[in-house]
Design a protein with these regions (language model features):
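Charge-dense, helix-prone N-terminal extensions
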Residues: 1-111
Length: 111
């Protein structure tokens, strides 16, 4: 999956918006693209690297996903009880990544 496909997928959800919320923290050294629904973030990734995404996840599913896939790692600067990072082009199929991104959107949309 490439960055354009992933961005288009995240923006395909009703009410989804994209923003670059972390500019002031990294002073232009890193650029993150984040996706929101109802003003709340459900996914983000570093634009320059595009090596992983961070998404909200059902707490009951995190341990199972971590055991099943090496590509599931603790998130950077998010609560690991509710968020995971998924490395792209690793052992998790794109179809499963998309399912989890969709699930993240649904979790956040209901908040």
């Amino acid at each position: 999956m490439n960055i354009e496909e992933f961005r288009d997928y995240c923006l395909s959800f009703p009410g989804s918006e994209e923003k670059t919320p972390f500019e002031k923290f990294f002073h232009g050294k890193h650029s993150f693209l984040a996706f929101y629904v109802n003003g709340k973030m459900f996914c983000y990734f570093e634009i320059d690297k595009f090596d992983r995404c961070t998404i909200k996840c059902n707490p009951e599913e995190i341990e199972e996903l971590s055991a099943a896939y090496e590509s599931v790692i603790p998130p950077y600067n998010c609560n690991p009880k509710y968020w995971i990072s998924i490395k792209f082009n690793d052992d998790m199929p794109d179809k499963e990544i998309k399912r989890l991104v969709r699930q993240s959107y649904e979790i956040v949309r209901k908040l």
